Regions:
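Bacterial N-terminal signal peptides that target proteins for export
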Residues: 1-8
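Bacterial N-terminal signal peptides
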Residues: 8-16
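Sec/Tat signal peptide C-region and signal peptidase I cleavage site
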Residues: 18-22
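Intrinsically disordered, low-complexity segments enriched in small/polar residues
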Residues: 23-114, 125-127, 131-182
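Short, well-ordered beta-strand segments enriched in hydrophobic/aromatic residues
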Residues: 114-120
Length: 182
């Protein structure tokens, strides 16, 4: 009888610990994966380059993707209904829903222009908004990214250098339109 009582107490304690642990884990906000401090070198005109130093920066934070020249990584989307509710960093591009490549190709406008390539590996079209900082300009620019078709790739070009590009407001779109499906 005493053994049954001890066994019951042990089971109750284990369950209480498991529930407490699960509540603690779900209550903790997700900490973004950070890239180490780095120096970015960008070509700003035909003959000149500039360096920009950044402290630790997230790859993804609060459903926004932070890109710098030379980046190539993926994200996963959590979709509920027809809405993107979460964007998370995925370093393994083979497991990512979207893969981003951001670069300053030498062959574009004397190496000054920027190119963003997006590979969409999900079964829905995706669109997003961009905001970026241009060296020497005080204000950030805003842009809409053309919808990337399901299972396809798309490339966006800008004729100027971009020190940092932030992508946000990820939306699923219906065929032939950039507005979210309701």
């Amino acid at each position: 009888m005493r053994n049954i009582h001890l066994f019951t107490v042990a089971v109750v304690l284990c369950l209480a610990t498991a529930v407490s642990s699960a509540q603690t884990k779900s209550a903790k906000p997700k900490t973004p994966v950070m890239r180490e401090a780095f120096t970015l070198r960008l070509k700003v005109d035909k003959d000149h380059s500039e360096e920009f130093h950044y402290d630790k920066q997230p790859y993804v934070s609060e459903n926004e993707v932070y890109l710098f020249s030379g980046d190539k990584f993926g994200v996963n989307l959590v979709v509920k209904g027809d809405r993107v509710v979460e964007v998370s960093y995925q370093p393994n591009v083979s497991k990512a829903d979207l893969v981003f490549g951001f670069e300053q190709p030498k062959e574009l406008q004397n190496g000054v222009a920027m190119a963003l390539t997006i590979d969409n590996k999900i079964k829905r079209d995706v669109t997003m908004e961009a905001m970026g900082s241009i060296p020497g300009k005080k204000d950030a620019f805003k842009d809409n990214i053309a919808p990337v078709k399901a299972g396809k790739s798309s490339t966006e070009f800008w004729p100027h250098p971009i020190a940092q590009l932030v992508l946000g407001n990820f939306r699923l779109t219906t065929e032939g339109t950039a507005s979210p499906k309701k």
